[in-house]
Structures are given as C-alpha cells and as structure tokens.
Amino acid sequence: MDLARRAAGGDRRAFAALYDRHLDAVYRYAFYRLHTDAEAEDVTGEVFHRALVAMPKYEPRRPFLAFLYGIARHVVADHLREQRPSASFEDAIAHASDAPGPEETAARLDDARRLRAAIARLTPIQQDIVIFRFLEERSTKEVAQLTGKPESTIRGIQMRALAALRAALGSEGER
C-alpha cells in the first residue's frame, strides 16, 4: 500500500514520510506566491496541518502532491486576503543573488519588479501555471495533474499568460 493510502487510513508515520517528501515543493510554491521566508514557512505549516486534518477525505486516485497544492492555493489565498506581504519580490531576488555589483543589482531589481507586477496582473490560475511550469520546471502533464485540468487547457492558459506577460513587459519597456 502506498504512503498516501496509509496516511489516509490514519498512519502517522506514513504522513510524516509524505511531509518529508513534499515539504520543499510546498514551501517553494508558498515562497513564489508570498516572497518571504517567514510567510512561506507559516503557510507551509498550515498546509500540512490542513492536509493532516483532511486526510480521511483524500482520494488516492489523485496524486498526493495535487492534493497538497490544492490546499496550498487556498491557504495562500487566505493569507493574501488577511495581510499584504511585508517584503517585496525585489528583496527576495536580492537575497537569492550571488552578490552582484550595484549596477547589476539595480537592473535585476528593476527586472524583478516589472516581472512581479506583470505576474500579479495574471489570473490566479495563470499565476499557478507560470509558477509550476517555469519556476518549478514541471511538465505540462504534471501541471495538469496538479491542477486537475486537461493538458490542452494548461497549454491554452499558459499561452494566454505568456502573451499577457509579453504585452505587459513590452509596454512597460516602451515607456
């Protein structure tokens, strides 16, 4: 019996193994959406707490990571409604850098600001697909499994999201 089925049956050790296996993926998703370590850690903890409570409702035919991402989308949305992020996307990029020079830092921060603003104008599902496809580097098939949408729908949403990003970034660059 696989870990998710055992965890759904109340096996705490199986759930702990699932936690260890998927912690980083859930944290990265939360960080990409919220942009601060503290908020991502808080949301990640809440996701696993809700997952533990919801395990009796888990449907084993669906990938466990899709179950977690569904919970994560709701927890992130709740968090964003409750408060605004305290640190900016630019701060996150600056902390992730390898200490570039001031000119490069300024250019990266400006690019990050523009990209963050453009992504923020996308619909929530477009944001998720951009995160999963390009930041998490997941295949279209994996994104379809995670979102519960057909691959053709994922490709269409991705195409519209990228067109919107190109338009937004192109129009900002022309100002």
Regions found by a protein language model. Name each.
Residues 78, 86-108, 112, 139:
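Internal acidic/polar
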Residues 129-133:
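A short pre-motif secondary-structure segment
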Residues 6-17, 27-46, 146, 151, ...:
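Short, charged helix-capping/linker segments at alpha-helix termini
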Residues 42-49, 62-74, 156:
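Structural recognition of an alpha-helix C-terminal capping motif at a helix-to-coil junction
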Residues 81, 122, 127, 162-175:
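Short, Lys/Arg-enriched C-terminal cap helix and immediately downstream tail that follows
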Residues 22, 157-162:
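Residues within the DNA-recognition helix of helix-turn-helix
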Residues 2-6, 114-122:
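Short amphipathic alpha-helical boundary/capping segments
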Residues 32, 53-60, 70-90, 108, ...:
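Arg/Lys-rich amphipathic alpha helix in sigma70-family domain 2
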